[in-house]
């Protein structure tokens, strides 16, 4: 396996691509949206440092997967994921993993390309222990129930209204200025009856 040492041509190419440099910007999704829109959702530890491929302009991280929540059918006969791929530069939404704790588990939601798991700065990547118990329950079993019929509809400014009875109005950003408000940490948009979805608590019944 070859790591990709920078060359003069590679450095010049990077400088050309990043001038003028523009920061990657994206709106963080509700966790349910991240689950539903991702092809693969796993829990894993980052166990290796980034390896940069100067030709393809990507970097990859070695991981140790501990649990898969979504992606069994997409991965078919190769369910074990050992590497995650991302653009090599933050200006084009490359993800840079900054935690040095190799025993820390992360929830990672990404897309498949040629059998490889890809993520960006805009992907949902979060320390497992930082997530609420409701979010962990959502990724484990509940969010999937809303993927086919329901849509989390972000509301970031007034006025905003639902465009469909299958939409749930997400107001965390509007009310708290954060994407990590009550609806994000404790609720899921799930079918209430045919043709209608509502916010529902992710707390276990009886809790």
Swiss-Prot record:
- The residues that carry sugar chains are 53, 101
Indicate the annotated site residue(s) for Involved in metalloproteinase-binding: 37
The secretion signal range is 1-23
As stated in the Swiss-Prot or TrEMBL entry, residues carrying the post-translational modification Phosphoserine are 178
Q: Which residues bind Zn(2+)?
A: 24
- Show the GO cellular component annotation of the record: basement membrane; extracellular space
PTM note says:
The activity of TIMP1 is dependent on the presence of disulfide bonds. N-glycosylated.
Which cysteines are disulphide-bonded?
24-93, 26-122, 36-147, 150-197, 155-160, 168-189
Which GO BP terms apply? cellular response to UV-A; connective tissue replacement involved in inflammatory response wound healing; negative regulation of catalytic activity; negative regulation of endopeptidase activity; negative regulation of membrane protein ectodomain proteolysis; negative regulation of trophoblast cell migration; positive regulation of cell population proliferation; regulation of integrin-mediated signaling pathway
What is annotated about its quaternary structure and interactions? Answer: Interacts with MMP1, MMP3, MMP10 and MMP13, but has only very low affinity for MMP14. Interacts with CD63; identified in a complex with CD63 and ITGB1.
Q: What is this protein called?
A: Metalloproteinase inhibitor 1
Starting at the broadest rank, the lineage of the source organism is: Eukaryota, Metazoa, Chordata, Craniata, Vertebrata
């Amino acid at each position: 396996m070859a790591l990709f040492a920078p060359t003069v041509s590679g450095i010049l190419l990077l400088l050309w691509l990043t001038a003028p440099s523009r920061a990657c910007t994206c709106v963080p999704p509700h966790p349910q949206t991240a689950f539903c829109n991702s092809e693969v959702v796993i829990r894993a530890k980052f166990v290796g440092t980034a390896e940069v491929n100067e030709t393809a302009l990507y970097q990859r991280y070695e991981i140790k997967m501990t649990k898969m929540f979504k992606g069994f059918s997409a991965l078919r006969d190769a369910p074990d994921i050992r590497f995650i791929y991302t653009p090599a530069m933050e200006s084009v939404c490359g993800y840079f993993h900054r935690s040095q704790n190799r025993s820390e588990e992360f929830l990672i939601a990404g897309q498949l390309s040629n059998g490889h798991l890809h993520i960006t700065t805009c992907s949902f990547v979060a320390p497992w222990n930082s997530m609420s118990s409701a979010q962990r329950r959502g990724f484990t079993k509940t969010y999937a129930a809303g993927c086919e019929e329901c849509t989390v509809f972000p509301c970031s400014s007034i006025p905003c209204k639902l465009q469909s009875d299958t939409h749930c109005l997400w107001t965390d950003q509007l009310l708290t200025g954060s994407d990590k408000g009550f609806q994000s940490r404790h609720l899921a948009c799930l079918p209430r009856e045919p043709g209608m979805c509502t916010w529902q608590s992710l707390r276990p019944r009886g809790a």
